[in-house]
Amino acid sequence: MKSGRYIGVMSGTSLDGVDVVLAAIDGRMVAQQASYSHPMPLQLKQDILGMCQGQQTTLSAVGRLDAQLGTLFGEAVLGLLKQTGVAAHDITAIGCHGQTVWHEPEGDARFSMQLGDNNRIAALTNITTVGDFRRRDMAYGGQGAPLVPAFHQALLSHPVERRMVLNIGGIANLSMLLPGAAVRGFDTGPGNMLMDAWIWRHQSQPYDKDGGWAMAGRVCLPLLQQMLADPYFSLPAPKSTGREYFNAAWLERQLAGLAAVSPVDVQTTLTELTAVTICEQVQLAGGCERLLVCGGGARNMLLMARMSALLPGTEVCLTDDFGISGDDMEALAFAWLAFRTLSGQPGNLPSVTGASCETLLGGIYPVLPLGGR
């Protein structure tokens, strides 16, 4: 096992910044030592959004964005090192997810595209970098997502208690950790993504703090029913999705043809959509005793309250209560996946992704011991 100190870097679909964590990893033991949040420049965020939503682009624009994100991720790692005083030579490796700009897990040429040049990260930090985690799973017929359930299984499973772990980022994904059963996991649908886009459009706020705006509105049942009729929600697992599907254009199509709905009621209804689509999947799997929630959505008080109401037999709690920061869960997972790759251990779960077999994940971008610069 390649035990040591690892750095995980995550920039998710919410585009609310770059999360960086430092952790000591030794087998099943993952001890978080520090975290750092690096801002996402507004222009870069807008460029990513444009690409994610299928706007016309060029190879030059894709290449530039790949380079810019690689530099941003490298600078984020340097920010963590500066904050902690840890030297680069004390880090075994960086695990970097990259920035997803397109995820197309079905069809003859299934693929997932994460930008953020790992060569630049390695060069800027002088630390071996592991990245491009999703495409190996897809090469074996998998969805390439979600990958975090393997980490959830390693750290949060229980021998007798029925647990599920829910990450609410831009997209919500669920890991089912049920005793005696293979781990299952999939994207339930929108997490914060539509809520964030809507409040930005109408309130110029990046997110609905504590769910406060949504609390002032009412659920519009015709809109909720229209959205719930989307075929994605009835697809069987394995399944995964992203901003290329659930985006502002999708929401506009749902609103078209309905009587006018006030902006605040749309926000309330989007919150209810996230809660209902999550809880329906929990119930379809036979329920659980604890639903452990992480990600930015865990801070949305209305969303948490609605899930508790929809799951009366389940304790809805935070992963923080079990020793894992909900804000840092995904970055920690990719530090752990880098550890798995360098240790020669598989990182995917075929029962989750639908791949034909377990496999090593990612590419390794090594550096010379003394820097080579």
From Swiss-Prot:
Keyword flag Cell cycle: no
Top EC group: transferase
Gene3D superfamilies: 3.30.420.40
Enzyme Commission number(s) from the entry: 2.7.1.170
Keyword vocabulary terms for this entry: ATP-binding, Carbohydrate metabolism, Kinase, Nucleotide-binding, Transferase
GO biological process: 1,6-anhydro-N-acetyl-beta-muramic acid catabolic process; amino sugar metabolic process; peptidoglycan turnover
Family: Belongs to the anhydro-N-acetylmuramic acid kinase family.
Function: Catalyzes the specific phosphorylation of 1,6-anhydro-N-acetylmuramic acid (anhMurNAc) with the simultaneous cleavage of the 1,6-anhydro ring, generating MurNAc-6-P. Is required for the utilization of anhMurNAc either imported from the medium or derived from its own cell wall murein, and thus plays a role in cell wall recycling.
Full protein name: Anhydro-N-acetylmuramic acid kinase
